[in-house]
């Protein structure tokens, strides 16, 4: 799921992309958040907490030992670790992080729904049959 946003605040135009990769394994979910927004490590820690909000919006509850993993990284400051010279880095304004948080939640929610709808009926170990979600019923649920 890729989301392109343009955020306006105090006449400051900030454009960034967020790409969400979802891996659902049994009852566990792994969410990888990739962005080109120039966010620093302490800001990425805050961004990496946001997929839990998307899970909650979809009705999931956290269990002890649920094993959900959320990881975030940014490509916004490429070359910042060049050891041959001094470098300047950009930092996404803290008062504008809400747009990154909102994009992360929305993109995660949509990626989860897309993953659920894309699943197909399958037969697993010991003949256990798991049915795909009926796409038309899922569409109806989200249209209301």
Language model segments and positions:
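A structural signal for small-residue-enriched, beta-sheet-centric alpha/beta enzyme cores
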Residues: 1, 6, 12-17, 24-144
């Amino acid at each position: 799921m890729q989301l392109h946003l343009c955020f306006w605040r105090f006449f400051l135009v900030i454009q960034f992309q967020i790409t969400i990769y979802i891996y659902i394994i049994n009852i566990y979910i792994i969410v990888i958040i990739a962005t080109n927004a120039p966010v620093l490590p302490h800001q990425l820690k805050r961004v990496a907490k946001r997929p839990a909000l998307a899970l909650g919006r979809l009705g999931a509850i956290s269990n002890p030992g649920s094993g959900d993993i959320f990881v975030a990284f940014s490509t916004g400051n490429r070359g910042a670790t060049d050891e041959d010279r001094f470098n300047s880095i950009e930092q996404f304004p803290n008062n504008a992080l809400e747009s990154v948080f909102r994009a992360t939640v929305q993109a995660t929610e949509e990626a989860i729904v897309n993953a659920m709808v894309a699943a197909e009926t399958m037969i697993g170990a010991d003949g256990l049959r798991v049915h795909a979600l009926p796409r038309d019923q899922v569409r109806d649920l989200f249209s209301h």
